[in-house]
């Protein structure tokens, strides 16, 4: 019994790694010696037997068993065993445990049986078939082993991760490679896998994943998995780091099925499964101690087992006989007996057999002899505890058994270790309903093929599932919840009921974690094709239930047997001095490894032998070593008491040394970790520095602005654009179809028309009025009526009657044929349209997929958000990323500032180069380019900054102070203003110098031209001395002044308008951006100072430019005004002289020859030249210029001007002229300086010198008319009379005749003669005066004629009308302003020159000399000028000049004569009409 119980424990341990073989463990004799010392003398034969057992290994040891055990001893043993049987914790009989022991012993291949026993020596473990056959036939004839081919069968289980065809191919390949074997060796697998030509690293990983059992060989599912993984790698996919749970479960399940289906053909595979399946029936049989027959009952029937076991109790000799017969029937039974010795380490079979008689016979005695003599109980007491530990796990061996149970539940990967058998045996020994029933060998063998153990992975899965459903952590799951969970499996209700019954053996109506795992495992096995067992397999008994029951039963049995043995043997008198400790040493938690007195190992504590020499270990440190079971609170009181103080101190020192060593190791480990941490930190810092440097390089790169362009935004815009195009496709297709329909209808209509022409009488020409153009009956009736009328009309007209109408069928057929043709074309086009539409859709879909794949990559988006937006990273990394972003933004701002400063420098240089050509500084609006920002915020900030800068510039241009320019102090502002003034002065000086140089250049050109001018008309008639040098100079200056005035006016107006606009915009934008600027202050505080500096610089530039321009404008205006006033004075003075001289000349010419052409041959150029110019001064009569203003001033009062529209004549006072000069440029400004005064009334035009400065406009007309000098002379004579009244008409003439605008430049024309010299001032009043004075000079050949006419000015009545008439005729188109003037009497001679001046540059070709007098009369408004000026007498030499001066000085007399002349001239004018 002892060996039986311990064999279960030892058998379990023997199968575990790290446990010594049975033969190496301490002999059982030592333990039995201790036991014998405790027993009475009746037990002495037992030690003797043991001694013999220890002494040798012979069959004689079996004899000492009967010899050593007297009947009394047997009775005493039986006396103890009935107690064991009576205990509720041990309901099973003692004999089946012997068989149980045998079953476990059959697992130990190390044991040998001496030849004396008659048992053959078996190094390999027996299979269940062999053991069953040995039971069946005592003769020892073993049945023939099953065919090996049965093991090569592959279960018909479908693997889900490969196809059926692939699985069939893999099966064929596997069978061809392994033959009858169930596994493929590593070499064969290597040869096959190398054919895939995959790298060695991949094949190594595939092998690691495929070899799930880690056995170095592959089962078929593992081979199929390897081929599947090879296929994955060959197709380019990556290998997984771990197998998916589904594939792993399928492979492991199929491997279990294969490995347990063929235990007989491969003993090494069936070895782990034999024990548990054999244990189960033995436990159910409840046979207690006789362990030697444990492994056998898997195959034999229950009756055979009982028969063999009953032989033992019938008689002592029968028992050894039975044992021997059992050994005889078992070729390997000796090994099974030795496994009992496995419970007693190091014993051989003979020893173990002796041990069996020694202790087992006590066990057999209780089995067969219930109630023998009392001396035996000490033996059963000692054995009983040993048995109890074997059953309950109370001893260290039992500790291994409960350890095995958890191993099956999660600490063992497969049930092949034999532990399931031991635990099944222990569970069978526990009182459970239904365990007393017998089992057939078939049932036992069936159980042996099914592995019911729960692996660690499965247990973890079940526990997680339980925790998930146990939301309130109650520790159990109720029936309703379990029904809900288990109902999801899809099993039948009957199967679920059976599973529930098995999982809830106590009928509590709820399942704890272990029971729930059992239920789930049964469901899992049922789903995998396993039948639901009728009774719960021992491997599936929850450890909590089994351990609790075993513990309770063990304690009860130990207490009862100990008390009984002590009472019978008297050992209670010295419980600690007997050498055997029943309670302390037999700790069912295995806390102590040393027996109390003698230092010998108790049979129940053999498991701790290997660790006994390792020194002291506390219970806390031992806890994990005992496979999770909590050791006893104290290792052993006896051992503690027996340790001396020195030993304890030694142990303490050793422990202290160990602790110090551990602490030292911990410190070393901590130091190493610190060193590694420091190294890692250094590496991290170096990497961060590298990242920063790379980021800086990126930011400073010229193309850095393009790296952060939002490709996603562009891609989204492309997708939106693509979507818009896709939306247009249906509409386009609809339009195409509509057009196709229209085309088809048009074709049909065209065919009908053609058919109607070709067959006029056919019905095809009937126009249908029905829906869709269908021909109705009414249409046919109308067609027939129309045909009849056509026939009658033909008959009446005598025409041949039209041929008979064709039948409607022919026309319908033609129409139908054409319709079919058109329809076919239409369908063809529709098909093409559909194809195009489909292709467009496909193309759009491909484009959309491309854009979507590039943009909607979740991994890329996650990485971007993680490493760019710092989402989901540690704080250190997030701070680092933010720091990089700040540095990038700062680098971008610096780069933008640099580019902006460069741009501003460029603009400033441009501004300095041409400050006067720009009305306002444009850099303010575009000084900063739209450089793309690295981020959206940067772009927004840059836009705001540019807007703020524009606002500041506009405000500066408008004269407003920017609101944010608060950093400028008073001193800075003063310095800035001082600098601005200096710059303005400098610029003004530069402009004056440049203007003076230009003026000097023009003067030099005019002087050079005037020197060459007189030579041209010399061939015809020597013209008067050209006094045009000074006049031209004045004319050029006047033109320059005029241009400057116009330019200044334009600039001022543009500046004013732009200033107003900018001020308004600045005010609006300032209001809008004040809040934004206020918010940006904190963010851009660092950039603000530089920005304000730039703004101040720009503002200073703008203000300086404005001030410079304003100063220049004012200077130009002042200069122009002064020049105009002077010119006006000179104009008035010289105009009077010109009028007088011109009138005298005209009278002389009229007297000499009526033919104007002959008389104008010499004076034509002289008359034409001054038409557009007003001579400023005369070289001949400088004094006249000074005295001339006096006469006009005296003549001004009497000029009440009969024309209200012309209040002042050309001879109005210089004051009025000055006023007109000062105000006209502003009043009548225009883009075209030559058309400014067109809209002004004639009187303002006459009074202002503006028409004089604009005289060059009409110079081309004189040039055009200069082809005929006589006509020009006549025109000059006609126009010379109203010299002062044509200022307004000149403007209108120039506008009405713009064909010569190309020569209207007043800058540099030298119109000295009538030939080809055209100067802008040629027709001006100054030039005319110069010519007039020139004619007075002595060299003039016409001086004699001038001498004849000094007296004519007083009586020019007959001549004035003629002059007046000729002037208007030449000036016919220029007298528009005079049309509104009332017709007062024609002006006196003094008025004639003004007309000539004004109309000098007539655009109309020279008309015939006699112009209409009525037209002349309106143009006479200049009568305000006194007609009697004596200048007519001056044309002839010095006397004429003196007479002219005298007449000019006599202002009042002239005024008085003017009145008389006016009446005379009016009469003369009427006579001329």
From Swiss-Prot:
Residues 678-759, 963-1163 form a coiled coil. Component of the PAN1 actin cytoskeleton-regulatory complex. Residues 24-47, 79-92, 344-360, 925-934 have a biased composition (Low complexity). Residues 166-254, 458-547 form the EH domain. Residues 1440-1457 form the WH2 domain. GO terms for biological process: endocytosis; endosomal transport. Belongs to the PAN1 family. This is Actin cytoskeleton-regulatory complex protein pan1. Component of the PAN1 actin cytoskeleton-regulatory complex required for the internalization of endosomes during actin-coupled endocytosis. The complex links the site of endocytosis to the cell membrane-associated actin cytoskeleton. Mediates uptake of external molecules and vacuolar degradation of plasma membrane proteins. Plays a role in the proper organization of the cell membrane-associated actin cytoskeleton and promotes its destabilization. Residues 1152-1165 have a biased composition (Acidic residues). GO terms for molecular function: actin binding; calcium ion binding. It is a peripheral membrane protein. Residues 198-233, 491-526 form the EF-hand domain. Residues 1-121, 134-153, 266-366, 609-645, 793-837, 891-1265, 1277-1473 are annotated as: Disordered. Keywords: Actin-binding, Cell membrane, Coiled coil, Cytoplasm, Cytoskeleton, Endocytosis, Endosome, Membrane, Repeat.
């Amino acid at each position: 019994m002892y060996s039986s119980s311990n064999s279960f424990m030892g058998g379990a341990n023997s199968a575990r790694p790290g446990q010594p073989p049975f033969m190496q463990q301490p002999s059982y004799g030592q333990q039995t010696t201790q036991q014998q010392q405790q027993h009475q003398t009746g037990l002495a034969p037992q030690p003797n037997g043991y001694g013999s057992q220890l002494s040798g290994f012979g069959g004689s040891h079996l004899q000492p068993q009967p010899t050593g055990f007297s009947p009394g001893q047997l009775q005493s043993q039986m006396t103890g065993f009935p107690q064991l049987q009576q205990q509720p914790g041990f309901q099973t009989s003692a004999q089946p445990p012997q068989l149980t022991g045998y079953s476990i012993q059959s697992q130990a291949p190390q044991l040998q049986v001496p030849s004396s026993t008659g048992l053959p020596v078996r190094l390999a473990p027996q299979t269940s078939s062999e053991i069953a056959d040995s039971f069946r036939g005592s003769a020892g004839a073993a049945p023939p082993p099953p065919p090996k081919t049965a093991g090569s069968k592959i279960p018909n289980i479908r693997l889900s991760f490969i196809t059926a065809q692939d699985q069939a191919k893999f099966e064929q390949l596997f069978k061809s490679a392994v033959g009858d074997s169930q596994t493929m060796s590593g070499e064969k697998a290597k040869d096959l896998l190398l054919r895939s030509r995959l790298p060695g690293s991949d094949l190594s990983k595939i092998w690691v994943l495929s070899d799930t059992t880690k056995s170095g060989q592959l089962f078929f599912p593992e081979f199929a998995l390897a081929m599947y993984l090879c296929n994955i790698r060959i197709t380019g996919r990556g290998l997984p780091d771990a197998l998916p749970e589904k594939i792993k479960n399928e492979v492991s399940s199929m491997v279990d099925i294969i490995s347990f289906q063929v235990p007989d053909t491969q003993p090494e595979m069936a070895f782990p499964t034999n024990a548990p399946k054999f244990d189960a029936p033995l436990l159910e049989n409840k046979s207690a101690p006789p362990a030697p027959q444990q492994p056998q009952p898997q195959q034999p029937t229950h009756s055979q087992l009982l028969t063999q076991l009953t032989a033992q109790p019938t008689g002592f000799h029968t028992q050894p006989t039975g044992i021997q017969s059992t050994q005889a029937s078992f070729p390997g039974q000796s090994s099974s007996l030795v496994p009992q010795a496995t419970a007693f380490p190091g014993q051989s079979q003979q020893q173990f057999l002796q041990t069996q008689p020694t202790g087992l016979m006590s066990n057999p005695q209780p089995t067969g002899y219930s109630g023998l003599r009392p001396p035996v109980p000490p033996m059963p007491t000692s054995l009983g505890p040993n048995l109890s530990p074997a059953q309950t796990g109370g001893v260290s061996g039992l500790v291994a058994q409960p350890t095995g149970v958890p191993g099956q539940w999660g600490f063992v990967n497969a049930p092949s270790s034999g532990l399931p058998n031991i635990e099944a045996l222990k569970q069978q020994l526990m009182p459970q309903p239904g365990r007393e029933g017998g089992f057939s060998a078939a049932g036992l063998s069936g159980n042996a093929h099914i592995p019911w153990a729960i692996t660690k992975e499965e247990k973890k899965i079940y526990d997680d599932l339980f925790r998930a459903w146990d939301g309130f952590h109650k520790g159990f799951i109720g029936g309703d919840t379990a029904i809900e969970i288990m109902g999801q499996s899809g099993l039948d209700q009957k199967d679920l009921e059976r599973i529930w019954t098995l999982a809830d053996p106590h009928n509590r109506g709820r399942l704890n974690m272990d029971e729930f795992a059992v239920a789930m495992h049964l469901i899992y096995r049922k789903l995998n094709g396993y039948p639901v067992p009728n009774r719960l397999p021992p491997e599936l008994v929850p450890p909590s239930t089994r351990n609790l029951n075993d513990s309770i039963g063990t304690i009860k049995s130990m207490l009862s047997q100990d008390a009984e043995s002590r009472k019978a043997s008297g050992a209670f008198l010295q419980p600690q001095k007997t050498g055997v400790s029943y309670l302390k040493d037999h700790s069912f938690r295995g806390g102590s490894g040393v027996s109390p007195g003698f230092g010998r190992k108790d049979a129940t504590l053999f498991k701790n032998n290997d660790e006994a020499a390792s020194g002291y270990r506390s219970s806390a440190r031992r806890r994990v070593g005992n496979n999770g079971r909590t050791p006893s609170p104290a290792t052993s009181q006896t051992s503690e008491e027996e340790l001396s103080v020195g030993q304890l101190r030694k142990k303490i020192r050793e422990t202290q040394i160990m602790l110090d060593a551990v602490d030292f190791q911990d410190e070393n480990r901590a130091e190493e970790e610190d060193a590694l941490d420091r190294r890692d930190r250094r590496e991290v810092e170096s990497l961060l520095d590298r990242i920063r440097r790379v980021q800086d390089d990126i930011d400073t790169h010229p193309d850095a602005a393009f790296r952060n362009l939002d490709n996603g935004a562009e891609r989204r815009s492309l997708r939106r654009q693509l979507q818009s195009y896709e939306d247009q496709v249906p509409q386009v297709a609809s339009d195409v179809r509509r057009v196709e329909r229209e085309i088809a209808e048009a074709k049909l209509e065209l065919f009908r028309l053609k058919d109607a022409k070709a067959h006029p009488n056919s019905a095809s020409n009937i126009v249908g009025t029905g829906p869709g153009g269908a021909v109705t009956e009414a249409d046919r009736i109308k067609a027939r009526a129309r045909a009849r009328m056509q026939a009658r009309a033909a008959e009446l007209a005598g025409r041949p009657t039209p041929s008979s109408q064709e039948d409607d069928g022919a026309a319908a057929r033609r129409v139908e044929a054409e319709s079919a043709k058109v329809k076919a074309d239409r369908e063809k086009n529709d098909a093409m349209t559909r194809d195009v539409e489909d292709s467009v859709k496909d193309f759009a879909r491909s484009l959309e997929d491309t854009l979507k794949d590039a943009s909607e990559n979740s991994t890329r988006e996650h990485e971007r958000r993680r490493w760019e937006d710092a989402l989901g990273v540690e704080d250190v990394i997030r701070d680092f990323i933010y720091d990089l972003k700040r540095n990038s933004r700062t680098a971008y701002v610096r780069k933008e500032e640099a580019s902006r400063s460069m741009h501003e420098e460029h603009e400033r240089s441009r501004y300095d180069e041409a400050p006067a050509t720009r009305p306002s500084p444009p850099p303010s609006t575009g000084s900063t380019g739209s450089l793309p920002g690295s981020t959206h915020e940067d772009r927004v900030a840059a836009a705001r900054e540019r807007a703020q800068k524009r606002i500041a510039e506009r405000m500066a241009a408008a004269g407003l102070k920017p609101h944010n320019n608060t950093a400028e102090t008073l001193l800075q502002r003063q310095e800035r203003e001082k600098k601005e003034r200096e710059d303005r002065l400098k610029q003004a000086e530069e402009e004056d110098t440049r203007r003076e140089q230009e003026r000097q250049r023009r003067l030099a050109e005019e002087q050079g031209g005037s020197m060459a001018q007189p030579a041209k008309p010399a061939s015809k008639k020597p013209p008067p001395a050209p006094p045009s040098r000074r006049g031209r100079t004045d004319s050029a200056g006047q033109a320059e002044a005029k241009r400057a005035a116009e330019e200044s006016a334009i600039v001022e107006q543009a500046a004013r308008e732009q200033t107003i606009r900018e001020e308004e915009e600045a005010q609006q934008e300032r209001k809008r951006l004040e809040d934004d600027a206020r918010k940006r202050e904190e963010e851009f505080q660092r950039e603000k100072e530089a920005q304000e500096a730039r703004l101040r610089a720009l503002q200073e530039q703008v203000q300086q430019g404005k001030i410079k321009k304003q100063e220049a404008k004012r200077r130009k205006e002042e200069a122009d005004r002064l020049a105009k006033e002077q010119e006006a004075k000179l104009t008035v003075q010289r105009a009077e002289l010109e009028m007088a001289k011109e009138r005298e000349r005209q009278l002389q010419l009229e007297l000499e020859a009526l033919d104007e052409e002959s008389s104008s041959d010499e004076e034509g150029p002289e008359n034409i030249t001054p038409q557009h110019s007003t001579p400023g001064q005369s070289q001949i009569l400088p004094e006249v210029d000074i005295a001339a203003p006096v006469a006009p001033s005296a003549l001004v009062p009497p000029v009440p001007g009969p024309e209200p529209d012309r209040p002042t004549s050309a001879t109005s006072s210089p004051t009025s002229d000055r006023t007109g000069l000062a105000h006209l440029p502003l009043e009548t400004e225009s883009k075209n300086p030559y058309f400014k005064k067109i809209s002004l009334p004639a009187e303002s035009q006459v009074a202002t010198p503006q028409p004089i400065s604009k005289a060059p406009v009409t110079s081309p007309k004189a040039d055009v008319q200069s082809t005929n000098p006589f006509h020009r002379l006549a025109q000059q004579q006609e126009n010379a009379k109203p010299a002062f009244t044509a200022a307004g008409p000149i403007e209108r003439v120039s506008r009405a005749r713009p064909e010569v605008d190309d020569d209207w430049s007043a800058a540099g024309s030298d119109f000295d003669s009538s030939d080809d010299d055209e100067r802008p001032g040629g027709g001006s009043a100054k030039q005319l005066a110069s010519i007039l004075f020139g004619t007075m000079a002595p060299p003039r050949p016409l001086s004699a004629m001038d001498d004849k006419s000094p007296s004519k000015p007083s009586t020019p009545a007959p001549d004035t009308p003629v002059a007046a008439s000729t002037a208007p005729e030449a000036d016919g188109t220029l007298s528009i302003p005079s049309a509104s003037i009332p017709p007062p009497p024609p002006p006196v001679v003094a008025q004639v020159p003004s007309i000539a001046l004004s109309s000098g540059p007539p655009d109309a070709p020279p008309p015939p000399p006699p112009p209409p007098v009525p037209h002349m009369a309106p143009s006479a408004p200049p009568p305000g000028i006194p007609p009697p000026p004596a200048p007519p007498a001056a044309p002839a030499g010095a006397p004429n000049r003196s007479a002219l001066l005298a007449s000019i000085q006599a202002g009042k007399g002239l005024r008085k004569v003017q009145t008389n002349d006016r009446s005379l001239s009016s009469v003369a004018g009427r006579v001329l009409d």
